[in-house]
A protein has these predicted regions:
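Active-site-flanking alpha-helical
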Residues: 159, 356, 378
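Active-site-proximal alpha/beta segments of enzymes that process anionic O-linked groups
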Residues: 78-148, 153-328, 398, 429-430, ...
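Flexible internal linker/loop segments at domain or repeat junctions
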Residues: 317-335, 408-417
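Histidine-centered active-site microenvironments of extracellular/periplasmic hydrolases
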Residues: 163-167, 364, 369-414, 450
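A long, amphipathic alpha-helix that forms part
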Residues: 133, 277-287, 324-368, 424, ...
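Active-site rim elements
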Residues: 206-210, 263-267, 334-345, 349, ...
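Transmembrane and membrane-interface helices of multi-pass
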Residues: 1-97
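Membrane-interface soluble catalytic domains
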Residues: 48-51, 74, 79-81, 221, ...
Length: 485
């Protein structure tokens, strides 16, 4: 049972054409049958009442549509009260109790207010005051590429690079064997939803109490101050309250998508490989158009990754895994979805390899991480959950974090390359990424902290890693086993 709240309402208001299409594709025959049957029963009862001869003049004036409206309203209110009472006496968890009419109105109001406030937060994010006192002591003697690949909904334990029994990351496994890449053994996402996670990934906020994400320097503006070209490539929508690109798009020199002016909002978002020619085109043209920026280039690449609906994330030739290949059995339908998820990981691996190939002949430091993980019918508290959000779970918090260093980067900066490689068994949080990358490049703001620099020699975080979710933060113990090479 869904609880109507400001979160649900915000989702409805910000839903794009792509998401609407995927929602309709996911409606089951059983759901259609239940809805149709309920409507039919209401119509039959209303028609019967409308045909009856009543002594009451008021009831005689009732049309069938008035009966339908009245019965529906009574049903909704009664069901809401019933579930509220059941939740209060402990027969059902409060989280699945139906909401009242007051929450419907309040949730709508809150979501509309939140949408209006987003513009204000974006303006605050762009304030030049955030960078006051910033010092630059360049680490790199020559221009380099710093690349952050933001994946979607990938969990670490489904990658063969992290020990998964099936070969879901053959390209990455090969890069690791060749010495071009390595994985961090224990990385936690800062939040279990894309927007909340991105607020922490791309700023120096680090959940400082009493302040908001938009009151701190962001990764892109920091690198721009240091003389880097900045560009954001995306295979996701560029508009809407739930769009990362809407939040951070103004912080970069260029925002590019395969979908032109539509930005993927009205057109259907395709496979992640469609972004590859866009990356190649603008990587070369930026060097010509902005020759004054000598430090190099910061590129953010936002993939669709394993975003639900999984089967829409990869071409048919990547339909490799079947439900019989699923290790943890959960029934035919669930196993089929998990197999589709495995295929989406396999396809993302292919895309990562193709992106690396675009930068391989240049000095580049490339980081791939996921915004959050995914529950796949394996959450102890919610065994039927396939998705993310709400209360955090370990499956949603445990994400892959991969570093790829090109041969020319390793040759030019051997000590730094070794230091980054040696840090792969540190327990890290994606909330510390902006702090780490800026300090690595020699960019120091008044909010920088060497203790949170997980590539650095002084790494010693004074706070524990947490994953933000609905209702608060969750804390999970470090990974105790060695999962990566």
């Amino acid at each position: 049972m869904c609880v109507f709240s400001s979160i649900i309402c915000s989702t409805i208001l910000s839903t794009s054409a792509r998401e609407s299409s995927e929602f309709l594709d996911n409606i089951t025959n059983m759901q259609i049958a239940i809805t149709s049957t309920s409507l039919l029963i209401i119509i039959i009862i209303s028609y019967t009442l409308a045909q009856r001869k009543c002594t009451s003049t008021t009831l005689q004036d009732f049309s069938i549509w008035k009966y339908i409206s009245a019965i529906t309203l009574v049903g909704v209110v009664s069901y809401s009260i019933m579930n509220g009472v059941r939740a209060k006496v402990g027969n059902t968890p409060p989280g699945i109790a139906a909401s009242g009419i007051d929450r419907t109105l309040w949730g709508t109001y809150v979501s509309v207010q939140a949408k209006a406030q987003l513009g204000d937060r974006i303006e605050r994010l762009l304030s030049p005051k955030h960078l006051e006192g910033t010092t630059i002591k360049a680490t790199f003697a020559d221009p380099v590429d710093i690349v952050v690949i933001l994946g979607e909904t990938a969990r670490a334990d489904f990658l063969s690079a992290y020990g998964f029994k099936h070969s879901t990351t053959p390209v990455l496994d090969s890069l690791i064997a060749e010495g071009d890449a390595f994985c961090f053994n224990d990385a936690r996402c800062a939040a279990n939803s894309t927007i909340e996670s991105s607020k922490r990934i791309f700023t120096l906020w680090n959940d400082r109490p009493g302040l908001e994400w938009c009151d701190f320097p962001n990764l892109m503006s920091c690198f721009s101050r240091a003389g880097y070209r900045t560009i954001w490539y995306t295979n996701q929508e560029t508009e809407g309250p739930f769009s990362v690109e809407r939040m951070f798009g103004k912080t970069v020199d260029l925002l590019r998508t395969p979908y032109g002016k539509s930005g993927g909002v009205v057109t259907r978002v395709g496979f992640d490989e469609e972004i590859l020619p866009v990356i190649g085109k603008f990587n070369d043209s930026l060097q010509i158009r902005q020759p004054e920026k000598k430090s190099g280039q910061l590129s953010i690449i936002h993939l669709m990754g394993s975003h639900y609906q999984y089967s829409l994330r990869y071409p048919s030739k990547f339909n490799h895994f079947k439900k019989e290949d699923v290790i943890r059995k959960n029934g035919s339908t669930a196993n089929a979805k998990v197999a589709e998820y495995m295929n989406s990981i396999l396809y993302t691996d292919y895309v990562l390899g193709a992106i690396y190939a675009l930068y391989r002949e240049r000095p580049a430091l490339i980081v791939y991480l996921s915004d959050h993980g995914e529950s796949l019918y394996d959450s102890p508290d919610q065994p039927d959950l396939c998705g993310h959000g709400g209360r955090p779970t370990l499956e949603q918090a445990d994400i892959p974090f991969v570093v790829m260093l090109t041969p020319s980067f390793r040759k030019s900066y051997p000590a730094l390359s070794k230091r980054i490689y040696d840090s792969r068994f540190r327990p890290i949080s994606t909330a510390w990424l902006t702090n780490t990358l800026t300090l690595t490049a020699g960019i120091r703001t008044r909010y920088s902290d060497d203790r949170y620099d997980f590539f650095g020699e002084k790494f010693n975080p004074p706070t524990q890693r947490t994953t933000q979710g609905e209702g608060g933060k969750a804390l999970y113990p470090p990974v105790k086993i060695k999962r990566v090479k």
